[in-house]
Amino acid sequence: MRRRQLRHAPVAVLLLAVISAGGAVGACARYGASLVWPTMPGTFPWTTWAVNTAGCAAIGVLMVLITDVRTVHPLVRPFLGTGVLGGFTTFSTYALDAQRLVDGGRTGLALAYLVLSVLAALGAVWAAAAAMRWFVARTRRVAGRRA
């Protein structure tokens, strides 16, 4: 190993540890949601849909907060964004749920689920980011008037 690579190795290990810890938190939260709100076979997978939509909304809020509002520690984004929210949202379960619907003869529902999930995820991240930007701008205007 080169000297330069050795110098950066502890940072890479720390980054991996932070992402892994966040991923464990997010995955446990998703699993908890599936226990509280189980999906019956052959029905629309509301839990996965809701988790992915909520996770995308949270990603929209997080990105505004850490890019537009304040500078945070460099490990906050990997921990919360890649780790917690990456572990909370789930593309693999999304695909598995769709495949189970197809296998159960519910192809139309599977297609609706696939399309609605993508639309909801993109809409959630966009709407949450826009709402957070509006809220931040409004808060700054109000604070500016008080000063």
From Swiss-Prot:
Highest rank taxon of the organism: Bacteria
Cellular component terms per the entry's GO annotation: plasma membrane
InterPro entries from the UniProt entry: FluC (IPR003691)
GO biological process: cellular detoxification of fluoride
Catalytic reaction(s) noted: fluoride(in) = fluoride(out)
Key words, A-Z: Cell membrane, Ion channel, Ion transport, Membrane, Metal-binding, Sodium, Transmembrane, Transmembrane helix, Transport
Membrane topology: Multi-pass membrane protein
One GO MF term: fluoride channel activity
Recorded coiled-coil stretches: none
Compartment annotation: Cell membrane
The keyword Ligase is assigned to this record: no
Transmembrane segments: 9-29, 46-66, 78-98, 109-129
Any matching Pfam family: CRCB
Functional note: Fluoride-specific ion channel. Important for reducing fluoride concentration in the cell, thus reducing its toxicity.
Similarity annotation: Belongs to the fluoride channel Fluc/FEX (TC 1.A.43) family.
PANTHER family (UniProt xref): FLUORIDE EXPORT PROTEIN 1-RELATED
HAMAP family on file: FluC (MF_00454)
Name listed for the protein in its UniProt record: Fluoride-specific ion channel FluC 2
